[in-house]
Each structure stands twice: as structure tokens, then as C-alpha cells.
Amino acid sequence: MATAIPDVQSAWVNVARGTPDKALAFKEDWPVSKNLSDGEVLVKVHAAALNPVGYKLFRILPNFVAGRPRVAEYDLSGMVVESKDDRLKVGDHVYGWIPSNMFRKTDQGALAQYARVPADALVIRPANVTPVQAAGLTLTGLTAYDIICKTAKVGSGQRVFVNGGSTAVGAFAIQLAKIRGAKVVASASASKESFVREMGADEFVDYTKVDLPKYLTEKYSTSKFDYIVEAVGISDPSLYTRSDAYLSPKGAFISVGPQPTGMTTSELWNIAKTSLAMVRPKIVGGNKAPFKNVIVINDLADAIEFRRYVADGSLKPIVDSVYEFKDALKAYERLMTGRAKGKVVVKVDPSVD
């Protein structure tokens, strides 16, 4: 017998601009979005994963841009409880994300008991992955997939440098590059070396102990990288502007894009310097290898292919820590330390693992 779907639910709602403790409110009467269109499903959320871009947008965007109030976050896992789709049925255990167009349309994010989601943004959760593990696979996983498998098309024997190997995108990028036969060098702080090597990195660089562009020049100028993956965000433009010394001109510098925390003067200046370097012609000192930004878009075919790596065990989910639903603010505190190794997950349904 099907469980009745309630009219209201508990949810963490972004109600104001600021840090998560000021921006979010726990509501117990947020409406459940039930009016499904064709190709949509209603998911009973089991777990939701946090993304750094979420709390950064809390701080940066004014209300009229952010569309507040709105339930926070994008990544989730759960069970389909209502369906207007031919592929996904009631009772299917799924994971995926809420794309930005649906987010704006419904004001419904992942940090709630129920979420209305386009069916093509979800795939069936493999049996070898728990709901908590699955919650954090999509946004960062598909970003890494786009970088390694579509933009770079990394092949066997190629050399890849991942800046930020302990970030979720970086850890997925390392694994995907190794699956495709590449040699991977990755950076992180010393405390994360074992984690980065566990992901598959062949060599490790402690970025806190060296001038990174200088170190890469000294060690890799005669064996240049085919691709550089900037998984941190544009924190140091010199990694690109000095990359002719260690990046093949036939390769590319591929970034997750700017990740400002508060639009400080230094952050804006770094973005400006990188933007200028991106468009400067080679004839007047521009870099030989192109700079490419990757922004993930909803693509079911990509999600299915990425899922295949998860299902066969060649790609590991990356969970740093797990918090109960009412402790979501503590989860954000963990994320904001910058010390998380992989995904910070909020368990919405206390009965799942």
C-alpha cells in the first residue's frame, strides 16, 4: 500500500543573504511540490550532499537575484514516490540532482523531505552504493566527467595534473583519469596525501610547501602535462599564466571556474587577471595552451556512463562526513573549513545508511 504524500514537509530554506547560520531557516511547513509535469518525478529524499557553491551564493547573491525564499542545495538520493515518466517508476531508488532551471521553477532544493525532479536528472542507484554515498555523486562527479572524458578526452599514457586533488571534483578527476590510463600528479596539503594517493594519484605535491608554478616548472618542464585540471577555482592565476613551462601547447588548462567566497578585492583581481590571460593572443605573450571553463549541464547520457563506473566498482564514492537533517548547519561548518576530503552529506531520512 502506497504511503500518502503529505502537503507540507520539513526543509532547510534559504531566506536571507549571509553565512549559512544567518541564511538558512528550518521550516516544518514548506509545501511539497506535487503538480508534476510530464517527464518529472517526486522523490522522497534519503540524503542530500552539500556543494561549496551553495554557501558561497548564500553570501554573494542579493535576494532579487537568488529568488529567496528557496530550499537549499542540488544533489540528492532517494526513492520515487510519484512519477509522470516512462523510465522511472514508483519505488525506484535513484540519485541525481535538481538542475538550475527546475530549482528556479519550483524553489525546491535537495535539503527537504521531498523534491520534484526532472526524470532525466536521475539514474537508478546501483546496489553497491548506499543512499548516503550516492547523494554526493552527481554535481561534482559529472563536472569531473565533463573535464576528463569530454573536454580533455584524456587517453592512455597522457599526463594530467590535478590542482586540488582532495576536493570532490579533484578526487573524481583523479579516478577518471586513472580509469582512462593516464599518469596523474595531484596537489593538496600534506594531511591529505594518503587520501589523494588512495584516489589513484601517482605523484603528490604539497602545495603549502612550494611555489607551485615554480615547482612544476623545475620538475616537469621536460615532461609536460597534457592537461591541467584546476579543481579549486581560480585562486592563483599564475598557475595558468606561467603554465607554458609545464603544460603542452597541444593540451588545455581546464577549470571549474571562479569560486569566490565573498567577492573580496583580491578574489575579483584574481578573476580579472585570469580572464585577461584567457583572451590575450599568443603573439603578445598569451599562453600557448587554451584556458577552458567547465560548467556542468544536465545530460542523462553522461549520468548513465558515470553510473557505469560506479556500478562496476572502478569509481569510488567519496564521503567526508555525514550529519543528521537537523544538524545541517554543522554540515556547512565542516564544509566551510576547507578541510573536507570529498562530500559532506546530510541524512534527510534517519532510517537510511
Which ranges hold each PLM region?
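C-terminal hydrophobic helical "lid"/dimerization subdomain
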Residues: A4, I295-D353
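NAD(P)H dinucleotide-binding glycine-rich loop of Rossmann-like/cofactor-binding domains
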Residues: W97-G164
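N-terminal Rossmann-like NAD(P) cofactor-binding module of classical short-chain dehydrogenase/reductase
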Residues: Y95, I228-V229, I254
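Glycine-rich beta-strand-centered segment in the early N-terminal region that forms part
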Residues: P31-L50, R59-M102, Q108-G109
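Short amphipathic alpha-helix with an adjacent loop that forms part of the alpha/beta core around
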Residues: D211-S223
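Mid-domain Rossmann-like dinucleotide-binding core that forms the NAD(H)/NADP(H) cofactor-binding site
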Residues: L137-V210
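Glycine-rich phosphate-binding loop and adjacent beta-alpha segment
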Residues: S235-S314, D349-D353
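Short, well-ordered loop/turn sites that connect or cap secondary structure elements
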Residues: R87-L88, V154, L247
